[in-house]
């Protein structure tokens, strides 16, 4: 990664990395086939709580990128958000594809959390402001609504 960043600017590297990640997520979604069901335990109460768990996941994902108090107080909000997202999906999906995809996301985010101290950047954090926490609440609410409304169109899996 550092070798690549000597040839191209950091912003371009991050943009290309993000595009490749989105492309990979699109390929995962396109390759989904519901006929590969396994006998995995489904926790019905998680289905009832899933809108709230996903709201929390979106909140922490957004909070990781804005200078609010959540980012200031929670050590790794993005790790927490991805963990909530992956575990919620694991708890409600009994098919092999979901277990492989969300299980891998969870394993990778746990590995990232365990190795995070070695990658700590010494960039000063901007002063936290409450306005960004309010903005995060609004964005997470809107994103939760949109994902729940359009989940079938976006990801090919209808929510029951």
Task: Say what each PLM segment does.
Residues 1-75, 80-160:
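Membrane-anchoring alpha-helices and their flanking helix-loop junctions
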């Amino acid at each position: 990664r550092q070798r690549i960043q000597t040839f191209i600017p950091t912003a371009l590297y991050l943009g290309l990395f993000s595009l490749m990640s989105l492309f990979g997520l699109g390929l995962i979604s396109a390759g989904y086939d519901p006929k590969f069901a396994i006998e995995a335990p489904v926790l019905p109460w998680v289905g009832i709580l899933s809108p709230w768990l996903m709201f929390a996941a979106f909140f922490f994902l957004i909070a990781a990128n804005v200078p609010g108090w959540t980012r200031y107080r929670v050590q790794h909000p993005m790790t927490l958000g991805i963990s909530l997202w992956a575990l919620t999906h694991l708890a409600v999906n009994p098919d092999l594809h979901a277990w492989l995809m969300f299980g891998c996301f969870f394993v990778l985010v746990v590995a990232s959390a365990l190795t995070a101290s070695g990658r700590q950047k010494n960039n000063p954090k901007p002063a936290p402001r409450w306005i960004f926490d309010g903005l995060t609440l609004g964005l997470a609410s809107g994103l939760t609504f949109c994902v729940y409304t359009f989940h079938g169109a976006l990801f090919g899996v209808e929510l029951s």
